[in-house]
Amino acid sequence: MMKYIYILLIFSLLFLKINSQNTILLNALIYDQTPSRNNDFQIPSPGGIAKGLVKSNLGSDNTPVLVAERSSTIHSPETFNQWFHNYPGVNLPINYQITLTQSTTNPNVYAYTNDAFFPIDGQGFDNKTNYPYEAVYRDERGTPHNFHFCLQIHSMFAYKKGDTFYFNGDDDVWVFMNKILVVDLGGIHGKATTSINLDRLGLTEGTNYPFDFFYCERHTTESHISIETSIELTCPGYDECGVCQGDGSSCCTKSNCNDNPNNKLNCITAQCSNNVCVKSAPSCPSINPCEAGTCIPNFGCSYSEITCNRTNCENSFCNKDTNTCERSPIANCVSCSNGPCITTDLCFPQKCDSKGNCVSSNKNCDDRDYCTTDTCQDGICIHTPIPKCVNCAGTGCITTNDCNPKVCAPDGKSCLTEVLCNDNKTCTKDFCFAGHCLFIPIDCDDVDDCTVDTCDETLGCVHTPLDNCIACTGLACITTDLCNQKLCTDNGTKCTEVPKVCDDGNACSNDRCISPNGTCAHEILQNCTDCGTFNCITLDLCSPLSCPTDGSTTCVSIPKTCNDNKPCTLNQCHSPDGICTAVPIENCVKCNQTNRGCLTVDFCNPVECSENGDSCIITNRTCNDYNYCTTDSCINGQCYNEIIQNCENCTNGIGCTTTDFCFQQICSDSGDTCKTVPLDCNDGLSCTTETCLGPNGTCTHTIIKNCIECGIEPCITENLCLPVVCGPDGSCLYNYTESTCDDNDACTSDVCTEYGCEHYTYTGCMNCTNGGCFTTPDTCNHYGCNFTGDGKCFFTHLECDDNDPCTKDHCLYSGDCYYEKLTNCTTPTPTQTPPPTQTPTNHSIGVNECDCCPEGQYCLLIFGHERCFIANDGGDGIPEETIGCPGVTTGTPTSTDGGTGHYTESGTGNPHLCDRHHCRSGMECHVINGIPECLPSKYKCLDCLDLHCEKQGGKTCFTIENQNYKPNIKGCKDDSCCKYTPTCR
């Protein structure tokens, strides 16, 4: 897109006159924009000039206010607000100056022209060092430029007649004068011209008004600007950013960065860099030999300063920037031999006397003017003028009476008095009152109410008579309207209006008196009949009025007759002008008879004259197209042949229409009947069910569950426990085996249901390596698995003999031994013999299992403890428990645990539970209600071990019945699969 900015502006941005004869320097604030941060810029479809985008009054923050939903090139009030306000990260403020040069043809006009107006090229987002990822935009020659920015100006001007404002350019330009919109050229557009004569704005000459200028460049590819101005713009004050009446927030300045008191209070050095305040870490560098610095938070740097030498009239200090002593002279000081003489009151300056001491003198303030009072204040001579004083050569003449002022005598050494109260006018009397001259008009009243009394400087008093005036007693009756003449009444004390009579005796005339000259007028009434004492006025000529003949006063109406004697015309009288018209009747046919006409109302049934013309005949219009797949009809005389959808036109006068495409209707071979043809939905597969869905004729193919394609027939499995497979010849065969659902777990019942294989666990069953073993709640008489032997189930009895004749030994139901003390019993002293040493052999279980059993014995897991047993105890079928092995990890007959010989973990003293070494491959040890049990490794319902519970404080793993358990449910989730839930107690 070719785009121009050719602006001829009569304005001053924010300016400073460098040379009042040659140039004007204009200060502007630019906000650099980029399409990647504000999508109001580089719009794909600019759209041209868009007036009315902003409100006619300037906003409270002196920027334009967007009118909502007015432009497709402005996305929202938020994006528009970023054009002329500081938004860190969205735009960048940049100060800019334009120099206007005085016109050579008109010295009151200054101008600036630039055919490549890119004021911030290489700056802001165009600086690739700081913003390397911002897009580059180029002109038609391929030269990169910064095309996206908004410029704003705020100033004041004193209006003078003849000021004008003219510009020619493109893109958004708004100018406000006195905060009112005077130039409205919004949008992205081509060149447009506007000129303003400020004389038409209703401004007061010499009065100061605010001037606000806003301009945005929002699109490629060219930029031109030409400015002219005759307006004298000024600014009351600039902020540190160079913005007229700004608040200093549009840029990084010394006040908000370098000299920010908060930085100094915390010993931080800050300076502006790329319009961003960069701060250092807190520090107070030493500046010896003058100072040593210490940082005190919220106070700043504290320094110890040296004392510098000085003379009598000098102040000395150590410069912290140069680290050197510097001296400055003391104002109004004279160095005398005996010390400094400092003048504190300049009206009495101090000086040295001959002895080197200070003496005071007086300042001479005489201005040799006799009309001033001369005084001295703070060393400055003040000459106060004496009111009403004339300065003569040798004296001052002061006037005390303004009617008789004092003036200088001819010699200038004395005063004379003047007389001023005489205006030399005939019509005034002259007086002097309280020192002021009074000139009072003379009284010319002739006591005549019908005269106007005035005074003429040449003639004196003049008495001019009033027209149409009658002098009454103490008042004048003046007639201003001769249609209502004023006369004296009530013995001359009152004026009364008497209307003028203008009746001409004609009932058909409108009589009136014309003010103010009193002329009678008689207007003849239109369409009026004079009936003597009254009139009859016709308002509607289709019903004229006439005088009655019965002696009454009621007018008679006679309707006007309109008839052209034609049967096919409509005769009417038009009110109120009474004109007769004859309108032809549409669709009417005149017959042979003179007054006979036939009117057609329905063109599908036209009306015609009879053969002899004495009557009308109704006929019918034929619309048959002889197509049996159309519906023939006549509407308002128009034939319609609507095509019947999905219809086949047969040969013998019928049409076959299909309403359901699952059953299509076609013509029979003879063409006189329709026949039905079903839609073929067969997909050629045996394991699908075909269905046609009407009326659209959509074929669906539903897969038959558990069906496989065989050569001869489809094979459908109705019972998952009896699957059907393809035979060698393509026929169906049943494929049933006994081991289909066997999970190789002796403690489960394996069944096949409609859902497939189901496995139900037997309660109280332990899965041994060679069959199952059902346990009992009686832990004193226990069934367990022989993991180290034949892997079958065997029975054990817990012995609780403590070899103490004074105790009664009990095996509790919980599996604990209880020794009841007997009364009146004495325990004999035993002979102390060391326990025999049992040395493990190579035939015992590995060191990670039972380390306590010698050859010929095996380890059993009883109540969670490993214990050593021999094969039998002499024929009763119950293994006999033996002593353990010596060492720190085994028990002995005299140990505190009763010499059970079970394995203990080093340093813990806790009985070792069953672990992975006691369960075959694919199984793991779980403890259910205190009883160890090998279960499948993926058995998710039981996952706590006694060892885990013991680490929680000597607890044991138990299972409780799960209330959420759902038996025989295929695809159970979470804990609904588990009949028991593990818990530590």
From Swiss-Prot:
Residues 102-247 form the PA14 domain. GO terms for cellular component: extracellular region. It is found in: Secreted. InterPro entries: Fibro_Slime (IPR011874), PA14/GLEYA (IPR037524), PA14_dom (IPR011658), Prespore-cell_inducing_factor (IPR051154), S_mold_repeat (IPR001673). The keyword Signal applies. It holds the Pfam family Dicty_CTDC. The keyword Secreted applies. It comes from the Eukaryota. Residues 1-20 form the signal peptide. Glycans are attached at residues 127, 309, 424, 491, 517, 527, 592, 620, 649, 696, 735, 767, 786, 824, 842. Keywords: Glycoprotein, Secreted, Signal. Transmembrane segments: none annotated. PANTHER family: PA14 DOMAIN-CONTAINING PROTEIN, PROTEIN PSIB-RELATED-RELATED. NCBIfam families: Fibro_Slime (TIGR02148). Belongs to the prespore-cell-inducing factor family. This is Protein psiQ. The gene is psiQ.
